[in-house]
Amino acid sequence: MSDLKHLTGLCNIPASNITSILDMAAGYKKKLITPCPSFEPSLQNKRIALVFFENSTRTRFSFEIAARHLGAGTLNFSASSSSVSKGESLSDTIKNLEAMQVDAFVLRHPSSGAADLITRITSKNVINAGDGSHEHPTQALLDMFTLREYFGTIDGLKVIIIGDVLHSRVARSNIYGLITAGAEVGICCPVTLMPPDADQLGITLFTDLDRAIAWADTAIVLRLQLERATGGYLPSLEEYSVHYGLTDERLERVQKHLLVLHPGPINREIEIANNVADRIQPPGYSKSMLLEQVTNGVAVRMAVLNTLLTL
């Protein structure tokens, strides 16, 4: 049983809730990687609405797989084929789905704060699957799970987040969650992509990637939204790649072995080189956890669904 009704972000969430979710996910992961995984149908007869106003591959499919492993049914909502295309508001959409007796909402929306909004108009559980540049809590939880599984603990780890931190909901949730779990967090990006409140977040700030890598135990590389190059934030994608792209040459120069995470999708040869993204074993100065993160995402989202829906 849990006292957690919604998961709209990791800001102010107690460490005990994070630990409980990660511990539960560890149990699910052990079964997931067996040839024929079988789980207790703890969410049998539950109906979960996957309400995605933005495209998604990993998040939407992993929530759907997670729900089915636990015995729940899913309703897949597409904004383009719904009454939203006729002008229906988010509030009316949620109220109508609730009237169909769904038990929970998993929401992805382009507007920051959308998930918090619907917690005020529904009595059902709400899980934020990414809202604008606000938060993406389950991505951060799966990143934290990946780090804990590899290092044994998050406490004391130095984690550098590289890229467009200003617009990144993944960065926000990771900063909040990792600090709560005892990690030291740094961010590395051009000053044009530095959040205005960065110096109030309790993190270390870098604009030089070599220095950031030398400081860190592990790196979370963010997807560069390609429109930033034409929006005045960057001179060009090529220049960004030269100064902030994670490459073997840079790691060798700094002489640093680094565990590398990325939330996906990746822009190959822009924020991360092919060989860094794909290397899962030595030789080399990096170890990629990108596909391991995807596997862990199912386990973590199972834990989140079970935690919230078995109150």
From Swiss-Prot:
Its EC number is 2.1.3.2. PROSITE patterns: CARBAMOYLTRANSFERASE. L-aspartate binds at K86, R169, R223. The keyword Mitochondrion does not apply. It is an enzyme of class 2 (transferase). It catalyses: carbamoyl phosphate + L-aspartate = N-carbamoyl-L-aspartate + phosphate + H(+). GO terms for cellular component: cytosol. Pfam families: OTCace, OTCace_N. Keywords: Pyrimidine biosynthesis, Transferase. Pathway: Pyrimidine metabolism; UMP biosynthesis via de novo pathway; (S)-dihydroorotate from bicarbonate: step 2/3. GO terms for molecular function: amino acid binding; aspartate carbamoyltransferase activity. It comes from the Bacteria. Gene3D superfamilies: Aspartate/ornithine carbamoyltransferase. InterPro entries: Asp/Orn_carbamoyltranf_P-bd, Asp/Orn_carbamoylTrfase, Asp/Orn_carbamoylTrfase_sf, Asp_carbamoyltransf, Asp_carbamoyltransf_Asp/Orn-bd. GO terms for biological process: 'de novo' pyrimidine nucleobase biosynthetic process; 'de novo' UMP biosynthetic process; amino acid metabolic process. Carbamoyl phosphate binds at R58, T59, R108, H136, Q139, G264, P265. PANTHER family: ASPARTATE CARBAMOYLTRANSFERASE, ORNITHINE CARBAMOYLTRANSFERASE, MITOCHONDRIAL. Catalyzes the condensation of carbamoyl phosphate and aspartate to form carbamoyl aspartate and inorganic phosphate, the committed step in the de novo pyrimidine nucleotide biosynthesis pathway. HAMAP family: Asp_carb_tr. Heterododecamer (2C3:3R2) of six catalytic PyrB chains organized as two trimers (C3), and six regulatory PyrI chains organized as three dimers (R2). Belongs to the aspartate/ornithine carbamoyltransferase superfamily. ATCase family. This is Aspartate carbamoyltransferase catalytic subunit. It comes from Pelodictyon phaeoclathratiforme (strain DSM 5477 / BU-1). The gene is pyrB.
